[in-house]
Design a protein with these regions (language model features):
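Active-site neighborhood of HAD-like aspartate-dependent phosphohydrolases
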Residues: 1-24
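Short active-site oxyanion
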Residues: 5-9, 28-30, 47, 75-76, ...
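Generic beta-sheet signal
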Residues: 11, 35, 101-103, 137, ...
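HAD-like small-molecule phosphatases
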Residues: 16-125, 195, 199-210
Length: 210
């Protein structure tokens, strides 16, 4: 993609150390938005920029008191279902300005207004790219704000139904194969021959056969 002159931005809910454990080629990207929009990472220089306030210590202390298992990034606090009710009550009781985002069983806590979409906007501003020129891929709850920011929103075949309903394109293939499916068309003719209705129909036919 980069030899074609296009920019590559990875937008993820993972913390950078966790991301590096599962994927060690972040240098392939111009920028990385990590922690669900809280952190901007520049692979060329290794520089990290926090895009929000760090988690309040009072909130972390309350989670420890309540024996909630969690991990902490520079801007994100993450735990898992079924702890969301305890987390929401802690936020309410403390009166801290935090919100909860779900991601396939993960429960992510961030400052209000911070999400993948706001992180992408920060990356695009740095790159000088309009959101109208962005093709984004998603599959989970935390991708709603992200895909809403993209000019062309793509949901892979294994994405949640609610995400598919709002996507411009739904791929035939799942996971990375679905991403590759669209990228091939993008490199070939900038998606000129990519008919969203055709791909949605393919998904409907696949469901009928099951």
């Amino acid at each position: 993609m980069r030899p074609s002159g296009r920019k590559l931005v990875l937008v993820t809910g993972r913390r950078l150390p966790d991301l590096n454990c599962v994927f060690d080629r972040l240098d392939l990207f111009d920028l990385v938005v990590a922690e669900n929009g809280a952190l901007l990472y520049r692979p060329d220089s290794g520089e990290e920029e926090l895009l929000c306030e760090p988690p309040p210590e009072t909130f972390l202390a309350r989670l420890r008191e309540l024996a909630v298992p969690f991990s902490v990034g520079q801007g994100i606090v993450a735990t898992w279902e079924p702890h969301q009710d305890v987390v929401l009550k802690a936020i309410h009781d403390l009166g801290v300005e935090l919100h909860v985002i779900f991601n396939k069983g993960a429960v992510m806590v961030l400052p209000s207004g911070v999400n993948k979409g706001t992180g992408l906007k920060a990356a695009l501003e740095e790159l000088g790219v309009s959101s109208h020129d962005v093709v984004g891929f998603g599959d989970a709850e935390n991708d709603h704000a992200f895909l809403a920011t993209c000019g062309c929103a793509v949901a892979v075949a294994n994405a949640l139904p609610a995400l598919k309903e709002r996507a411009d394109i739904v791929t035939r293939a799942t996971h990375g194969a679905g991403v590759a499916e669209v990228l091939q068309e993008l490199l070939k003719d900038d998606l000129a021959g990519f008919n969203p209705d055709t791909f949605r129909q393919a998904i409907l036919e696949s469901r009928k056969r099951k």
